[in-house]
Amino acid sequence: MKLIPQPQQLELQEGTYRIGYQDRITLDAACSPAAYGYAKLLAGELEEQAGISLLIDRRTHTTHPGIRLLQAERPRLGREGYELEITPAGVRITGSGEAGLLYGVQTLRQILRQEGLVLPCLHLTDRPALATRGLFYDVTRGRIPTMAFLKDLADRCSFYKLNQLHLYIEHTFLFDGFSEVWRDDTPLTPEDILELDAYCQALHIDLVPSVATLGHLYKVLRTRSFHKLSEVDEPQSAPFSFYQRQCHHTLNVTDADSLELVYRMMDQFLPLFSSRLFNINGDEPFDLGKGRGKALADQVGSHQMYVDWIGKLCRHVEELGKQPLFWGDIILAHPETMQELPQDVICMNWDYDPAPREDHAQKLWAQGANQYLCPGVQGWKQTVNRLDLAYANVKKMASLAHKYRAAGLLVTEWGDFGHLQDPESSVPGILYSAAMGWNAQLPPEEELNAGISVVEYGDRSGQLLSILRTLSQQVVFNWGHVVELSEILSGRLTDETPEEFWARFLPQIQPNLHRIQEVNGTIDACQEAICRLMPAMDRSGRKRMLPFLLMSDGQKLLNRLAAIWEQQYLGSANPLHQNPVDLAAQLETWYASYKQLWARTSRESELYRIGQTIFWLADQLRSLS
């Protein structure tokens, strides 16, 4: 039996209990009103898995055994802890608090998915190792999810005992007075936030407001309304660039209007959330002190400018009655300056390398700082998330979180370069973090992959994720490479010439250029293996395989594109003997299917920008003929 996260203590015992159609789900008298919602979750699971509808009751019956839900404080378990007992007489879940009762129900739902109506007798005691186990989700760099998807995401977070969700905003909220910023988009509305916040509250998920307040304000600072607040001037007529959106576009912190702008955004956004937290972000201010603020930087240094700015924002958050969070990439250059910030501020310590640095966590710990350790699901700039890199990164960051007694583990899902990757391929990385934030005994990769295959995808063989892991590695030319080169060739990016790009980039891909046919053959084999596995999967799992099949088809096309461009710009032989015109048509046909896949989970957002890149590639390929 697979459980994610793995419980702290699990004792399997002799015997079974068979749930009958006359059983009831009984709420103890001490249960809060929220317990009825948890009972409904359980009843829905039983109907889905076994086709039986159990009545929910609040009276104790001797004639109707079944499942009892109780709330009783257990100080040693904390408010999120619970006990689950299955005996020949029935099932009993005791939550130390509301959240604990919910998590006990979620664990029983996982057991039901694997065991059906005949449950093994067991005694399970469980509680989280880390207080905060969260997901940071980018809804600003191209893909804005539908409300249905966001609720499904919250359901999945709760199912795996995550208790915090950040939706990252730069410009994709309907801020008053910002119509020039969001006029061509499909932004989230105040009602969207209120609806999602209430939905998350019922699942014991803290929906945290998260707004860019220093760097990464590309779309805001390219408008006529706010252009003058940019640290470094850029012609407003400059064409859109995925690459440039990741760089530059930092606020001029010496301009009082910049502070007024950020306060307006914060003051509009914060009242929509019930959370006691506010995430001001503040990462990667690449231009700070290099343009309009250079005089101050020469006087006090850019680091002090940063600390002073973050300090102002933190104090404003506290004045609004909330606790601030910010990214730690800049403060780590001088961790002692944490002492200049409010004592309760939380520093989000990110590192997405498969072998992240330990000294950053150690330095913040030495300063007595509250910190979250923040790994990533490794999907940005990819067609399919790199599961091998995600596991390695999450495991190391989780180990540091436990070692340095961090306040939490917050896994990130970023959407660099248009958020091409489908949300489905981020699920394994999210579950890696859920498993490792709850239990400090970090499971081996094969074991965890087998568990996710069984619990999340209903794959009784337990093989699915090992196949997806191999599939995700078959990359010669990724989406990030394609975007960079296309923007250089089209003149949207002038930092490098094509020749300079190839000189920098070729060593990264050259070992695999002669293997494109082999790599694409491995993709074909993985796709075949997924399809052959479907009979071992439940229906819901089968329906979720399309994103992996479609996106890996896209990766095959990008790999073939590498061979043609290498031939064109470096004079190499075309090992695949392919016709550029044929590849152009295949890219366009693939994009037509991709648009349908996008619409399953996302608003229109900036899908058209991905299309523009695909169409430009197709036009270039036709010009080569």
What are these regions (language model features)?
Residues 30-31, 141-143, 353:
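A generic structural motif
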Residues 50, 57-60, 168, 211, ...:
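Short loop/turn and capping residues at structural boundaries
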Residues 131-328, 338-340, 346-348, 357, ...:
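Substrate-binding cleft of carbohydrate-active enzyme catalytic domains
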Residues 33, 93, 144-145, 289, ...:
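A generic structural signal for short coil/turn motifs at secondary-structure boundaries
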Residues 46, 53-56, 207, 324, ...:
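Generic structural signal for residues in well-ordered beta-strands
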Residues 1-133, 396, 419:
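Contiguous, structured surface segment used for ligand recognition
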Residues 122-140, 372-381:
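N-terminal small/glycine-rich loop or linker at the start of catalytic domains
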Residues 2-14, 19-21, 34-39, 62-63, ...:
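Substrate-binding groove of N-acetylhexosamine-processing glycoside hydrolases
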